[in-house]
Design a protein with these regions (language model features):
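Phosphate- and other anionic-substrate recognition elements at nucleic-acid/protein interfaces
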Residues: 1-130
C-alpha cells in the first residue's frame, strides 16, 4: 500500500453548498481519505459550531462556495472574520464541471459540495470580495 505524504502546511479544504435554510459542508483533511460531512443551519450558533470544528484541525483552512443570492454573505463574513481563507466558485464553472464529472445535469446539495471540493483541488476558485 502506498503511503500518502502530505506537506505540513497543506490546508483543510472546505466546500459549502449554500442554500436558504441550511448549507451542506464537505471537509477534506489532507492526510485522510474519508471526507467529513456537516449540515449547517443558516444561524449564528451553527456558524460558530462550524468555525470551532475547523479551528480544531490545527491547520490552515480554505473555504469555497458558490455565491447564491445573498444567502452566502452571513456565513462568508463569519468565516472570514474567524480567520479562514474564503474563496468563491463560479456558478457557470460549477455547472459545467458538474455536467462533465457526472455526465448529467442532475443537481443536489451533497453532489454540489463534492463538485466544489473537486474545483478547489484543481485550483479553479476565485478570491471572495464582499
Amino acid at each position: 500500500m502506498t503511503k500518502i505524504i502530505v506537506a505540513q502546511d497543506a490546508p483543510v479544504l472546505v466546500a459549502i453548498d449554500i442554500a436558504k435554510a441550511r448549507h451542506e459542508v464537505l471537509i477534506a483533511i489532507p492526510d485522510k481519505k474519508r471526507r467529513r460531512r456537516l449540515t449547517v443551519l443558516n444561524e449564528l450558533a451553527d456558524f460558530n459550531r462550524l468555525a470551532t470544528a475547523l479551528k480544531e484541525y490545527g491547520r490552515p483552512v480554505r473555504v469555497a462556495f458558490e455565491a447564491t443570492g445573498n444567502y452566502h454573505r452571513a456565513l462568508a463574513y463569519h468565516l472570514a472574520t474567524s480567520g479562514f481563507e474564503v474563496k468563491l466558485v463560479s456558478s457557470v464553472a460549477l455547472a459545467r464541471t458538474r455536467e462533465a464529472l457526472n455526465n448529467s445535469w442532475a443537481k443536489n446539495d451533497p453532489k454540489d459540495a463534492q463538485v466544489i471540493l473537486h474545483m478547489m483541488e484543481i485550483g479553479n476558485e476565485q478570491y471572495y470580495h464582499d
